[in-house]
Amino acid sequence: MSVSKKDVEYVAELARLEFKEEEKDSFVNDLNKILNYMEKLDELNTDDVDIVVNPYYIENKYREDNVEKSMELKEVIDNAPESLEEYVIVPKVID
């Protein structure tokens, strides 16, 4: 598998990026070097290796996960800078 200039232009268009021609050529070269290096993985013999979906079986080792009483709605609304009925009004962060 190799990356062409057309591939780089397509991904750049998806990401809404613009590159000079020499930058595109550099990306093609760099990406092909990376892919060629990754092809070395095909040489590995993994017949005797067990399949592992997730090597890190994470457990909560720090504390028990206990349910605790939270603040009453009235207390939350009273402490909010701005509210409407039972909703806290916050500044808009997404267009």
Curated annotation (Swiss-Prot):
It catalyses: L-glutamyl-tRNA(Gln) + L-glutamine + ATP + H2O = L-glutaminyl-tRNA(Gln) + L-glutamate + ADP + phosphate + H(+); L-aspartyl-tRNA(Asn) + L-glutamine + ATP + H2O = L-asparaginyl-tRNA(Asn) + L-glutamate + ADP + phosphate + 2 H(+). InterPro entries: Asp/Glu-ADT_sf_sub_c (IPR036113), GatC (IPR003837). It holds the Pfam family GatC. Coiled coil: none annotated. One of its GO terms (biological process) is glutaminyl-tRNAGln biosynthesis via transamidation. It comes from the Bacteria. Transmembrane segments: none annotated. One of its GO terms (molecular function) is glutaminyl-tRNA synthase (glutamine-hydrolyzing) activity. Keywords: ATP-binding, Ligase, Nucleotide-binding, Protein biosynthesis. Its EC number is 6.3.5.-. Heterotrimer of A, B and C subunits. Belongs to the GatC family. Allows the formation of correctly charged Asn-tRNA(Asn) or Gln-tRNA(Gln) through the transamidation of misacylated Asp-tRNA(Asn) or Glu-tRNA(Gln) in organisms which lack either or both of asparaginyl-tRNA or glutaminyl-tRNA synthetases. The reaction takes place in the presence of glutamine and ATP through an activated phospho-Asp-tRNA(Asn) or phospho-Glu-tRNA(Gln). This is Aspartyl/glutamyl-tRNA(Asn/Gln) amidotransferase subunit C.
